[in-house]
């Protein structure tokens, strides 16, 4: 399945959840979801009663799209969480998603959304413990230091991300310690389930993949 390249805010409208895919626009009244809170298409305004399977599928699609993963990537991550003995499957799944380097770069405020964070990582603008890492799926460990390369600190995407934090549109999560003035942050600890932005019932995803 190819990566989605269409209008990003249509994805939020389709899922009925703000997936924060458009940077600053997603946090304001200009958000397409706030202006048109119904699914795209000719019959979008008509409320549809979803089956249990459809609700489970929608939950999976929403979380997958929020983190920008393809089906195989998401399924592999879920199966790893399911095998883990370090906690409940849902919590471990979210922790694995939040430990992706592109997600950490976004959460630290160095990008306005996860899609842009993925591009920033891929283009070699990010250092992990002083070394360049250009793999968005790289798994960050507790204690890792994430930094924007000195030569990359004035690129527009990084500035846009930091503006969202500085203008109060976004907050940096408690499990991260970020020195905005130094374009650097530390992944201090694993996040707890009640600290993460979980837009869907994780039990829906667990039940879907258990079939």
Curated annotation (Swiss-Prot):
InterPro entries the UniProt entry points to: Ribosomal_uS4, Ribosomal_uS4_bac-type, Ribosomal_uS4_N, S4_RNA-bd, S4_RNA-bd_sf
PROSITE patterns for this protein: S4
GO molecular function: rRNA binding; structural constituent of ribosome
Keyword Ribosomal protein: yes
Top-rank lineage group of the source organism: Bacteria
Domain S4 RNA-binding: 99-160
Gene3D superfamilies xref list: Ribosomal Protein S4 Delta 41, Chain A, domain 1 (1.10.1050.10), RNA-binding S4 domain (3.10.290.10)
Alphabetical UniProt keywords: Ribonucleoprotein, Ribosomal protein, RNA-binding, rRNA-binding
Xref: Pfam families: Ribosomal_S4, S4
GO biological process assignments: ribosomal small subunit biogenesis; translation
A cellular component term, taken from the record's GO annotations: small ribosomal subunit
Protein family per UniProt: Belongs to the universal ribosomal protein uS4 family.
Self-association and partners: Part of the 30S ribosomal subunit. Contacts protein S5. The interaction surface between S4 and S5 is involved in control of translational fidelity.
Function of the protein: One of the primary rRNA binding proteins, it binds directly to 16S rRNA where it nucleates assembly of the body of the 30S subunit. With S5 and S12 plays an important role in translational accuracy.
PANTHER family from the UniProt entry: 30S 40S RIBOSOMAL PROTEIN, SMALL RIBOSOMAL SUBUNIT PROTEIN US4M
Protein name according to UniProt: Small ribosomal subunit protein uS4
Organism this protein belongs to: Petrotoga mobilis (strain DSM 10674 / SJ95)
Phylogenetic lineage: Bacteria, Thermotogati, Thermotogota, Thermotogae, Petrotogales
Gene symbol of the encoding locus: rpsD
């Amino acid at each position: 399945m190819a990566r989605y390249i269409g209008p990003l805010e249509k994805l939020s409208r389709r899922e009925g959840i703000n997936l924060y895919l458009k940077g600053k626009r997603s946090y304001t009244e200009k958000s397409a979801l706030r202006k048109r809170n119904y699914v795209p298409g000719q019959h979008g305004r008509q409320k549809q009663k979803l089956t249990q399977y459809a609700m489970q599928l929608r939950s999976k699609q929403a979380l997958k799209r929020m983190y920008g993963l393809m089906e195989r990537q998401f399924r592999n991550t879920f199966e790893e969480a399911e095998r883990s003995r370090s906690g409940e499957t849902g919590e471990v799944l979210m922790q694995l998603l939040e430990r992706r380097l592109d997600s950490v770069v976004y959460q630290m405020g160095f990008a306005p959304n996860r899609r842009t964070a993925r591009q920033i990582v891929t283009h070699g603008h990010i250092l992990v413990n002083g070394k360049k890492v250009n793999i968005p799926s790289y798994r960050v460990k507790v204690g890792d230091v994430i930094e924007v390369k000195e030569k990359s600190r004035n690129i527009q995407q990084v500035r846009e991300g930091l503006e969202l934090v500085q203008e109060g549109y976004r907050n940096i999560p408690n499990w991260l310690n970020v020195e905005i003035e130094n374009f650097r942050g530390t992944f201090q600890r694993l996040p707890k389930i009640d600290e993460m932005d979980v837009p869907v019932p994780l039990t829906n995803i667990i039940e879907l993949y258990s079939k």
